[in-house]
UniProtKB/Swiss-Prot annotation:
Residues 55-593 form the PLA2c domain. GO terms for molecular function: lysophospholipase activity; phospholipase A2 activity. It is an enzyme of class 3 (hydrolase). The gene is plb1. It comes from Schizosaccharomyces pombe (strain 972 / ATCC 24843). This is Lysophospholipase 1. Belongs to the lysophospholipase family. It comes from the Eukaryota. Catalyzes the release of fatty acids from lysophospholipids. Required for survival under high osmolarity, for normal osmotic stress-induced gene expression, and for nutrient-mediated repression of sexual differentiation. The keyword Nucleotide-binding does not apply. Keywords: Glycoprotein, Hydrolase, Lipid degradation, Lipid metabolism, Secreted, Signal.
Length: 613
């Protein structure tokens, strides 16, 4: 009787899934839905993934900025946060215990502004980046040489897997990594979350039903809707995956209202269907709990994240209605990691009828070509400044095509931190990328950002500060800059911005922290979607050890010297002898080594502390 009942139940679920079949994908890769939601449709009872409509708060919801401005909500957040960062900066500098470094003089309104950028790279980058953040968090149980850096920072930026870190801790009351990691559900492949067939059958039907709610409400759907439903179930709500929780809802949390932690940002790029993606020509978009938009190409426009998904023309809705809950937390995490759409489309679970149905449905309705692209309503259609982005037709197109920034080659999301209005002095660039043959970082992400900055400056982009000079990708490996921390841009007068007096507009100093194997071989494929508990702990530990050079006191002191370098330069203060020695040891001297003899160098390191320590 048990097996007969089970079979009938599974057949019922399968029939439900079959009833959800939707029209085939159009050329833009999304599934078109012809049933439109009514203007005054109301919020549904109970948790629902479907967006819905409300009255718009004003006639125009696009915030157009002047050059060097930042969105008003972000400015207010940072103003509230300044008292916290000033105190935290003093604590961080004092903890360095470095002679000649006056914490009171080097903090306050003229003190450093720090941005932390975590690279993408799937679950590998999420876990390793989380380990690095734990080393910087004053709430962490064990003191490290970077303790308090997180509290002293203004920005925290993620993309792809690191967007899951940034978004996940932000949604969970900016929890500690120790608490956040207890919520993870990675011990089975994300598409096969349990060993029990019955559970997985229900899992597949739930995902299909949830996305169908969005389609039935009149909104186009994409592979990222399905992928977002999967990834959100691993970040704190394993049963339902936050179906009616939005990214913008984070603004109501107490930590956010009090600006207790860095301003969180996740990034996206653009790609047109049928075209190759280029890190130089793509437009980078960003989302925070407050706003979604871009500084690129002189567009300088943002909308409240809360109203993402609204069809606008020149900032106004034609019928006065705005969309709510399109910025579903899971969808935004999925949209920032469209690299994984291929895994979503190509997964194969034939152990359940529901698994076979969803597998056939995704392959039948979403083309492999352009599968990494998602199309959303373009909130900047008709906005005058958007016409400057002719390559993406941003001013005239009704759709905005987004992809994973990871796919541009700029795997460390530095671009938001290079905007002049943000006044970032130093960027902590945590590189958990997989660019080398053996899946280790090789400096390529910094080279890609440098090339993009040079192209942007040549095109007359006045928003971007510029960037430090960096060595070639070949030199990164041949000179071992990818297996130890390196400071780039130590001389603020010698950057792509040219020789000038150092000000807040000077390009930031970049502290490069590559993934190095200390206790574990962390060169794991980005495509891997499950980790054992032991692997998670090993990666968290390696992320902490790698970012602190095995908690080396001298490195911590030199890190503090790097943090205050722009402040010293702006105020014409001579660095202490101790800091000068640090700059000699850690700053890139401008040395290159592109000799042909290095063409075949393969970076394949060993564990520095022994595997499993």
């Amino acid at each position: 009787m048990l097996f007969r009942g089970l079979s009938l139940w599974m057949l019922f679920l399968a029939s439900c899934l079959s009833a959800l079949a939707l029209p085939a994908a159009e050329d833009d890769g999304s599934v078109k839905v012809f049933k439109r939601a009514k203007k005054h449709s109301t919020k549904q009872e109970g948790p629902s993934y479907a967006p819905y409509y409300v009255d718009c708060p004003s006639d125009n919801i696009v915030e157009s900025l002047s050059s060097n401005e930042i969105p008003s909500a972000e400015s207010e957040y940072l103003s509230t946060r300044s008292t916290i960062t000033n105190t935290a900066m003093k604590d961080f500098l004092r903890n360095a215990n470095l002679p000649g470094l006056n914490a009171d003089t080097l903090s306050g309104s003229e003190g450093p502004s720090i941005g932390i950028a975590l690279s993408g790279g799937g679950l590998r980058a999420m876990i390793l980046g989380s380990g690095a953040l734990s080393a910087m968090d004053a709430r962490h149980d064990n003191h490290t040489v970077l303790t308090g850096l997180l509290q002293a920072s203004d920005y925290l930026v993620g993309t792809d897997g690191s967007a899951w870190t940034v978004g996940g801790i932000a949604l969970n009351n900016f929890s500690t990594i120790n608490d956040f990691s207890k919520l993870w559900a990675f011990n089975h492949p994300l598409m096969y979350p349990k060993s029990a067939i019955v559970f997985n059958a229900h899992f597949y039907s739930s995902i299909m039903n949830e996305v169908a709610e969005k389609a039935n409400a009149g909104f186009n759907i994409s592979l990222s809707d399905y992928w977002g439903r999967v990834i959100s179930r691993t970040l704190g709500d394993t049963t339902y995956g936050f179906p009616n929780v939005s990214l913008s809802s984070i603004t109501s949390q107490e930590w956010y209202r009090n600006a207790n932690f860095p301003y969180p940002i996740i990034t996206f790029a653009t790609q047109n269907y049928g075209e190759d993606i280029s890190n130089v020509n793509t437009t980078f978009f960003e989302a925070s709990p407050n706003v979604f938009g871009t500084f690129d190409h002189g567009i300088n426009s943002f909308i409240p994240t809360e109203y993402l998904g609204t069809t606008l023309n020149n900032g106004a809705s034609s019928n006065g209605s705005c969309v709510i809950n399109y910025d579903n937390f899971g969808f935004m995490m999925g949209a920032s990691s469209t690299y994984f759409n291929k895994i979503m489309r190509n997964f194969n679970d034939s152990s359940t009828k529901n698994g076979r149905i969803i597998q056939q449905y995704l392959k039948g309705n979403f083309s492999e070509n352009g599968q990494q692209i998602i199309s959303i309503p373009n909130p900047f259609q008709g906005v005058e400044s958007a016409n400057s982005d002719a390559a993406n037709n941003l001013g005239s197109s009704s759709s905005l095509n987004l992809v994973d920034t990871f796919l541009t080659g700029e795997k460390i999301p530095l671009w938001p931190l290079l905007q002049k209005g943000r006044d970032v002095d130093v960027i902590v660039a945590v590189d958990n990328g997989d660019d080398s043959e053996w899946l280790w970082p090789n400096g390529n992400s910094l080279v890609q950002t440098y090339e993009r900055v040079v192209a942007a400056q040549a095109a007359g982009n006045t928003n971007v500060k510029g960037f430090p000079y960096v060595p070639s990708q070949q030199s990164f490996v041949s000179l071992h800059f990818n297996d130890r921390p390196v400071f780039f841009g130590c001389d603020g007068r010698n950057t792509t911005a040219g020789n000038h007096t150092v000000t807040r507009d000077t390009p930031p100093l970049v502290i490069y922290l590559p993934n190095v194997p200390y206790n574990y071989f962390t060169n794991i494929s980005t495509d891997r979607t499950y980790y054992t508990e032991d692997m998670i702990q090993q990666l968290l530990t390696n992320g902490l050890i790698s970012s602190t050079v095995d908690n080396d006191t001298y490195f911590g002191q030199c890190f503090a010297c790097a943090v205050v370098k722009r402040t010293l330069e702006r105020n014409n203060i001579t660095a202490s002898p101790e800091c000068q020695q640090c700059y000699y040891n850690y700053c890139w001297s401008g040395l290159y080594d592109d000799s042909a003899a290095n063409d075949d160098i393969v970076y394949n390191p060993t564990c520095r502390l022994g595997e499993g320590i």
